[in-house]
Amino acid sequence: MQTYPEESLRLAAKDEADLEVVSALLQDAIIAGADMHYDAQHECFMAVANRFCWERPALADMNDSSGGAVHERALCGVRIDHVTAVQKRRWPADMRDAFLNLLALKLLAMPKQDSDYLIELSFSGGPSMRLTVKQIDIVLCDLD
């Protein structure tokens, strides 16, 4: 995993362990349907996520309506390269207007004879997206 020495988050994920870190950082991120795009010609999936800044401490002297800690949020660009196919399950009909809560990114098992990987994005309420990728190559970058 490569990190960059700035306050904003910049990560490159290249293996399953890196993917787990990316998943943790994107847990509970809100992604608008209009902010997700698969570019088949360039084999990449891109999204803009409004993520919790889990790596930073909770804001001091602030609580939410239930008394819980309040964390900062940041807009984060996500790019997954080497994507050869996208499958959507239980996807909202009005996707462009939908806002989805990302629960996790998971690496799923592929058939033994297949050298590709399958990355699943799971959202609350049941929707999911499966990306078939030739290799794990993900970049996260907080947007200014």
Which functions belong to the PLM regions below?
Residues 143-144:
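Glycine-rich, aromatic-bearing surface loops/beta-hairpins
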Residues 1-46:
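Long, hydrophobic N-terminal alpha-helical segment
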Residues 2-5, 13-18, 45-50, 70-74, ...:
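A generic short-segment signal for beta-strand/edge and adjacent turn/coil regions
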Residues 62-66, 95-103, 136-140:
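General N-terminal targeting signals
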